[in-house]
């Protein structure tokens, strides 16, 4: 837990992605980002790990931080916040600094804060559902938030987004993003069916099934026998492995087996996936 304690702030419950800024992805390169913020995706996955490991107090600190950070209009949901819940994180380049190993620019803030990333809602919905599954400190406001988030998602789930990789170019219809839309709706449906909570379950179930059918049709390349990074493409990426982890498809499904083989062939180097 020492690493988690280092990256978390006891006073707020927020968990930062990293305590550093502008460390380069490659020496001398320009992909030097500021990661001293709380990404909802990263923190949601951390919450699940904390619950599974039995660190319920730490998990509840983050859940409470989440509820405070995203309070208000669900349309204003951001993919990241400051550790204190700050929303304004403008990206600024500090030209007077030399950068680590000459890697420029040095950045403060992160421009991805304004991106649309559909998958984040899936991870948040799954994380809050996990707290319910573990029967840890149930909170009626968490469900009210989930209902509001899903209601907003229904209005724009079919729009292209920047995806889990935070692409700074043209938004795409990313397969992983759409699968995580399914996750968000599925967890909402479960809240009603398995826990007796109130919600528009018929509408949620209808759109959930619609999204899944679309992903299986448009996010899958019949000729190659794999899911693809985005609709109309042929490349695979590592995020597709999460389709199994979140229950979108079984790991032994032939479509997933083909995807795994392609990822191993195209993206694996020395046992690591790029």
What are these regions (language model features)?
Residues 1-274:
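Acidic, mature catalytic/reactive cores of soluble proteins
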């Amino acid at each position: 837990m020492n690493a988690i304690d280092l990256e978390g702030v006891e006073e707020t419950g927020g968990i930062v992605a990293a305590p550093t800024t502008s460390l380069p992805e490659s020496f001398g390169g320009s992909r030097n980002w500021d990661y001293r913020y709380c990404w909802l995706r990263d923190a949601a996955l951390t919450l699940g790990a904390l619950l599974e490991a039995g660190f319920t107090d730490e998990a509840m600190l983050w859940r409470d931080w989440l509820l405070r950070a995203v309070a208000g209009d669900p349309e204003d949901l951001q993919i990241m916040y400051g550790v204190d819940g700050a929303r304004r994180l403008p990206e600024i380049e500090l030209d007077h600094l030399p950068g680590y190993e000459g890697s420029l620019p040095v950045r403060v803030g992160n421009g991805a804060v304004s991106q649309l990333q559909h998958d984040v809602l899936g991870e948040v919905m799954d994380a809050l559902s996990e707290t319910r599954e573990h029967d840890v400190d149930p909170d009626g406001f968490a469900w009210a938030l989930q209902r509001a988030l899903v209601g907003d998602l229904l209005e724009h789930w079919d729009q292209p987004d920047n995806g889990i990789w935070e692409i700074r170019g043209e938004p795409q219809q990313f397969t992983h993003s759409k699968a995580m839309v399914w996750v968000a709706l599925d967890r909402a449906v479960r809240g009603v069916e398995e826990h007796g909570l109130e919600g528009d379950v018929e509408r949620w179930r209808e759109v959930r099934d619609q999204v899944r059918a679309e992903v299986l049709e448009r996010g899958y390349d019949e000729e190659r026998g794999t899911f693809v990074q985005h609709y109309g493409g042929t490349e695979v990426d590592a995020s597709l492995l999460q389709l199994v982890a979140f229950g979108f498809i079984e790991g032994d499904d032939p479509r997933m087996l083909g995807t795994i083989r392609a990822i191993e062939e195209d993206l694996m180097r020395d046992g690591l996936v790029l």
